[in-house]
């Protein structure tokens, strides 16, 4: 429902467990052109210990992308597209597309794949636009057993495949393939 209620030309998603720096929106908006996605600096921490930054694959991706003049969805930036947070997205990219609520896990990644056919350019902020990603031990990502993860991954792979092959000319094969690999990885490593 939140997407339908959003007003304006760009949308920022912030998970209810997470928070952002005071300059987050201002810094992100300063790079918005209307047809680009803007990504920021991700800072991961365990609940109750925000002063201790955790190693985080998306922070590593940020460090590899920052300072580059051209950032592609096939670059390390693809790690940012496992979910809608940590970025500003043009509302036009989303249109009538919505999260698939049949999925308890993976719906964020599926949504981002669904809108990936719209991605033209990616811009990256300086490190002071921070998205603080909080890890909680009781998060939905940690609560499913292997049988549930396997079933969910199969359903996700099926949906990625349906979207890709229905509009094969619009979607990037490498990005599609990395979503399939990510779904398989989620079975073993939640």
Regions found by a protein language model. Give the residues of each.
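Short, high-confidence coil segments that cap the C-terminus of an alpha-helix
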Residues: 8, 34-37, 119-120
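Amphipathic alpha-helices of TPR/Sel1-like and other helical repeat/solenoid scaffolds
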Residues: 153-164
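Non-catalytic, C-terminal membrane-associated alpha-helical segments of glycosyltransferases
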Residues: 148-155, 169-190
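Flexible acidic/His/Gly-enriched loops in nucleotide-sugar-dependent glycosyltransferase catalytic domains
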Residues: 21-93
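Short aromatic/hydrophobic "clamp" motif used to bind/position activated sugar donors
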Residues: 11
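Conserved nucleotide-sugar donor-binding catalytic segment
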Residues: 66-145
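The conserved acidic donor/metal-binding loop of glycosyltransferases
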Residues: 15-19
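Glycine-rich, basic loop-to-helix element that forms the pyrophosphate-binding segment
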Residues: 1-6
